[in-house]
Amino acid sequence: MYDEHYTRLNQYRSLWILVFFDLPTETRKERKIASEFRKKLLDDGFSMFQFSIYIRFCASRENAEVHTKRIRNSLPEHGKIGVMQITDKQFGMMELFYGKKPVETDKPSQQLELF
């Protein structure tokens, strides 16, 4: 019973960060800037969900704020970028489809955080 209670609370305390962006890519320089922004997201542990949507699991709100701050510090000069945090419970309720075929959502892997 304790494990069920802890897991339930954890689903509401752990978060997913979603980063949505639309960056200009008309010139070679703009494409390079957009590519560098994507690389920074990947280097910070984000995974590509769709081409301009990246996601990352965070064990706590404090951890999510650290990663959100890193995004703020690496914003390109032009383009539109949105950052949203949702609970693990909300993320688990997402319905995914490839065409008309439903797809199960991935469970976050166990992560070890060292300070």
UniProtKB/Swiss-Prot annotation:
<keyword id="KW-0378">Hydrolase</keyword>
<keyword id="KW-0479">Metal-binding</keyword>
<feature type="binding site">
    <location>
        <position position="22"/>
    </location>
    <ligand>
        <name>Mg(2+)</name>
    </ligand>
</feature>
<dbReference type="GO" id="GO:0004521">
    <property type="term" value="F:RNA endonuclease activity"/>
</dbReference>
<dbReference type="Pfam" id="PF09827">
    <property type="entry name" value="CRISPR_Cas2"/>
</dbReference>
<keyword id="KW-0255">Endonuclease</keyword>
<keyword id="KW-0051">Antiviral defense</keyword>
<protein>
    <recommendedName>
        <fullName>CRISPR-associated endoribonuclease Cas2</fullName>
        <ecNumber>3.1.-.-</ecNumber>
    </recommendedName>
</protein>
<dbReference type="GO" id="GO:0043571">
    <property type="term" value="P:maintenance of CRISPR repeat elements"/>
</dbReference>
<keyword id="KW-0460">Magnesium</keyword>
<dbReference type="GO" id="GO:0046872">
    <property type="term" value="F:metal ion binding"/>
</dbReference>
<dbReference type="GO" id="GO:0051607">
    <property type="term" value="P:defense response to virus"/>
</dbReference>
<dbReference type="InterPro" id="IPR019199">
    <property type="entry name" value="Virulence_VapD/CRISPR_Cas2"/>
</dbReference>
<comment type="function">
    <text>CRISPR (clustered regularly interspaced short palindromic repeat), is an adaptive immune system that provides protection against mobile genetic elements (viruses, transposable elements and conjugative plasmids). CRISPR clusters contain sequences complementary to antecedent mobile elements and target invading nucleic acids. CRISPR clusters are transcribed and processed into CRISPR RNA (crRNA). Functions as a ssRNA-specific endoribonuclease. Involved in the integration of spacer DNA into the CRISPR cassette.</text>
</comment>
<dbReference type="InterPro" id="IPR021127">
    <property type="entry name" value="CRISPR_associated_Cas2"/>
</dbReference>
<comment type="similarity">
    <text>Belongs to the CRISPR-associated endoribonuclease Cas2 protein family.</text>
</comment>
<comment type="subunit">
    <text>Homodimer, forms a heterotetramer with a Cas1 homodimer.</text>
</comment>
<keyword id="KW-0540">Nuclease</keyword>
